[in-house]
């Protein structure tokens, strides 16, 4: 199938030819980065070095992380590929979970609020609409009670509405007006009834990992790095991808009955890499309300309990970082073969020194 210009049609979702995104049978896919940094000093304040302690049992066991099964957050059948170039120093050897911090971002608005405001729901699906309102914060519910659609819409997009979202305006406004009026088309349910029936459980929006959908003909890694840079304010040179590890996948069925896939690459940042909301970053101002580095226990608490797959992804990342060691190539060869060579790449190896097609943690 071709387009009007004579060029073959291209899907921005699966990156294949022959169909457009709206016709794609693959899950709606986003790409992102799970960045980590390591606080300097070992458990007793000593610097982490390559030695027997680095190769000992993982300090973070199944009791701390829950069941070993990853559920739908999978590493794939062969999670670790043969080594490719990597540039992470010895500061990542012998990690214990209390020294690892993961970068999380907090959305400006909840997914439920954004989906409602964009009209991404069926007016005749009260169960789904109710689920959207139950995801909203108390502040968002108050906004819906207080302001009209025009004011809410402009605030949602930070008064920077692109052509893409202007096309959604009429549809979203039409559904909003139907709910305000109630009547036969909405089964008698009104906007007011949905607001009053919401559980009002949340005071802040969701936390998660930087991610987003790729642009036309953009590679997966390029998309992940771009979204990471836009949403964190960090330059792409400030994070180093662990390239011999396949991305972690979060697969789930949304309340709208659409399949979603979030694919995350693991990346290392220096221990002194700091983050904050940049008032000059238009993407952060529009989409992000907070950002920070968090140890495992605090990070898992910030992810909402119903986001089971996202929690499993976080568990998977910590299992990898506590079970495997990232070694410069010369140290890796010394460990596994007794010989050292110049210019060899960094390797991700398990704590028993296994190399090659090492499988990820189960």
Regions flagged by a language model, labelled:
Residues 21-25:
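Cysteine-centered loop/knuckle micro-motif
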Residues 31-37:
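Short beta-strand scaffold segments in enzyme catalytic cores
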Residues 48-85:
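Long, intrinsically disordered low-complexity tandem-repeat segments
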Residues 40-62, 337-344, 350-351:
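Long, compositionally biased low-complexity repeat segments characteristic
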Residues 18-20, 90, 251, 279:
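Eukaryotic intrinsically disordered and solvent-exposed regulatory patches
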Residues 111-112, 117-124, 128-135, 141-325, ...:
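Unchanged
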Residues 8-19:
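Short Cys/His-rich zinc-binding micro-motifs
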Residues 1-7:
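PEST-like, low-complexity acidic/proline-rich intrinsically disordered segments
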């Amino acid at each position: 199938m071709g387009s009007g210009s004579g060029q073959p049609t291209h899907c921005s979702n699966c990156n294949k030819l022959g169909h457009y995104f709206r016709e794609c049978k693959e899950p709606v896919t986003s790409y992102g980065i799970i960045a980590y940094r390591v606080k300097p000093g070992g458990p007793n304040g000593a610097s982490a070095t390559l030695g027997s302690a680095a190769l000992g049992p993982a300090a973070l066991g199944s009791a701390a992380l829950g069941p070993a099964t990853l559920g739908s957050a999978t590493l794939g059948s062969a999670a670790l590929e043969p080594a490719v170039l990597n540039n992470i120093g010895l500061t990542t050897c012998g990690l214990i979970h209390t020294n690892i911090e993961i970068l999380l971002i907090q959305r400006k608005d909840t997914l439920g609020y954004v989906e409602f405001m964009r009209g991404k729901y069926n007016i005749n699906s009260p169960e789904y609409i109710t689920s959207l309102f139950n995801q909203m914060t108390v502040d968002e519910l108050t906004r819906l009670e207080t302001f009209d659609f025009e004011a809410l819409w402009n605030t949602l997009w930070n008064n920077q509405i692109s052509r893409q979202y202007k096309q959604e305006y009429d549809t979203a406004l039409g559904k909003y007006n139907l709910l305000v009026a109630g009547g036969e088309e909405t089964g008698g349910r009104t906007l007011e009834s949905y607001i009053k029936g919401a559980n009002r459980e949340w005071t802040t929006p969701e936390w998660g990992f930087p991610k987003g959908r790729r642009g036309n003909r953009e590679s997966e890694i390029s998309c992940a790095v771009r979204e990471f840079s836009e949403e964190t304010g960090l330059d792409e040179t400030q994070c180093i991808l662990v390239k011999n590890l396949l991305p972690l996948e979060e697969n789930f069925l949304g309340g709208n009955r659409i399949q979603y896939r979030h694919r995350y690459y693991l990346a290392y940042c220096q221990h002194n890499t700091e983050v904050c909301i940049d008032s000059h970053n238009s993407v952060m101002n529009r989409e992000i309300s907070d950002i920070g580095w968090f140890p495992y226990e605090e990070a898992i608490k910030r992810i909402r309990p119903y986001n089971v797959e996202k929690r499993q992804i976080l568990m998977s990342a910590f299992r990898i970082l506590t079970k495997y060691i990232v070694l410069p190539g010369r140290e890796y060869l010394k460990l596994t073969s007794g010989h050292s060579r110049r210019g060899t790449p960094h390797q991700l190896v398990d704590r028993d020194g296994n190399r090659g097609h090492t499988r990820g943690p189960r």
